[in-house]
Amino acid sequence: MKPTVWHHLRLCPHGHPDETIDDAAIAVDETGTIAWLGALSALPHGYAHWRREDLHGAWVTPGLVDCHTHLVYGGTRADEFAQRLAGVSYEEIARQGGGIVSTVRATRAADETTLFVQAAARLQPLLAEGVTAIEIKSGYGLDLASERKMLRVARQLGERFPVTVHTTFLGAHALPPEYAGRADAYIDEVCDRMLPTLADEGLVDAVDVFCERIGFSLAQTERVFEAATRRGLPVKLHAEQLSNAGGTALAARYRALSADHLEFLDEAGIEAMKAAGTVAVLLPGAYYFIRETQLPPIELLRKHGVPIALATDHNPGTSPLESLLLTLNMGCTLFRMTVPEVLQGVTRHAAAALGRADRHGALEVGRQADFAVWSVGSLAELAYWIGRPLCEQVVRGGTTVFRRMNG
């Protein structure tokens, strides 16, 4: 690529709307790395001969990060949506053989090509909203071959689309039917066979567990964490969504990258997260979709200074959400977060939840030039508008990979 100076832009380099530069410029070298940024009036003379790209006063933020998704799976669960509307709880559906296990059946039956095509269709709306990094979990295979298939598809998405994909092995997502009544035996399989094999194949960036009364116990979760730690892999946790099971404190002991959901999180768990540097990932799409009433403890998270990230939690059962911008709005309207909080929640803090705050979530000299260009008058509009296409252009590694066509 040709070295380029992107200029006449309003720059928000760290995702905080109170830290901006008017009439700014970003100089990107031939490797796609940011060589300089700041006020256009201070642009060094050495960049005078570089190609110019005029953004006509548009806002520029770091590329967005969706740090919790289950994007690869077979089928849908629209029928269960109707059941929930009729009063059947998520837990009841799961106990009747629905829920996660129904998606497991569909995912096992699908081949890699089918899973790729379906996941690609879910990914593209996110890319058109400025997402340049995304986490994709496994967890709908629940056997070695199917978990491998999911993670291979996730890797392929990162190779064939302009987005950095971080993969998370979530083999301990639910108990597969063939292990009914034998949860400890299944955890043996996860720890002794599935995780080592998939890690050796280079398919795993992090390890997650669903720690809940309808998922896995603290003791079982710790076994998975121990297996991940032996492999040098960071851990994450689905925690305190339906009850306070104490999973967050356990995650903090293992210095988890993040603990996610957290509606029933208590102050002791928050203190443990703060001490461990664990990010709180809140998922308002799931809260909305399954009509939860227990709000996550936003004020306590603020009080203790725990970084808060937001994500779509895209999945077929509890959050079939394909808009990170709508997630911003939900964070404000449902969880009473501020605009600075939600914007940092999908940039700097979301990157930290992936363990890659050094790579994503900010625009700084020496970093890859991943940024989004917005047709808004103020950054508050990113959380304000519902359904309006706001992203005009996405740049990844200094190259435009998306441009909205007018009309």
Curated annotation (Swiss-Prot):
SUPFAM superfamilies: Composite domain of metallo-dependent hydrolases, Metallo-dependent hydrolases
Entries under Gene3D superfamilies matching the protein: Metal-dependent hydrolases, Urease, subunit C, domain 1
Keyword Chloroplast attributed: no
GO-annotated molecular function: imidazolonepropionase activity; iron ion binding; zinc ion binding
Annotated Pfam families: Amidohydro_1
Broad class of where this protein is predominantly found: cytoplasm
Cofactor(s) in the UniProt record: Zn(2+); Fe(3+)
Recorded catalytic activity of this chain's protein: 4-imidazolone-5-propanoate + H2O = N-formimidoyl-L-glutamate
GO BP term, pick one: L-histidine catabolic process to glutamate and formate
EC number: 3.5.2.7
A GO term from the CC aspect: cytoplasm
Binding site for Fe(3+): H68, H70, H238, D313
Signal sequence bounds: none
KW Zinc (keyword) present: yes
Entry superkingdom: Bacteria
Pathway per the UniProt entry: Amino-acid degradation; L-histidine degradation into L-glutamate; N-formimidoyl-L-glutamate from L-histidine: step 3/3
Binding-site list for N-formimidoyl-L-glutamate: Y140, N315, G317
Cofactor note: Binds 1 zinc or iron ion per subunit.
Keywords in alphabetical order: Cytoplasm, Histidine metabolism, Hydrolase, Iron, Metal-binding, Zinc
Residue positions binding Zn(2+): H68, H70, H238, D313
Listed HAMAP family: HutI
Protein family membership: Belongs to the metallo-dependent hydrolases superfamily. HutI family.
Alphabetical list of PANTHER family matching this protein: IMIDAZOLONEPROPIONASE (PTHR42752), IMIDAZOLONEPROPIONASE-RELATED (PTHR42752:SF1)
Function: Catalyzes the hydrolytic cleavage of the carbon-nitrogen bond in imidazolone-5-propanoate to yield N-formimidoyl-L-glutamate. It is the third step in the universal histidine degradation pathway.
Protein name: Imidazolonepropionase
UniProt source species: Burkholderia cenocepacia (strain ATCC BAA-245 / DSM 16553 / LMG 16656 / NCTC 13227 / J2315 / CF5610) (Burkholderia cepacia (strain J2315))
Organism placement in taxonomy: Bacteria, Pseudomonadati, Pseudomonadota, Betaproteobacteria, Burkholderiales
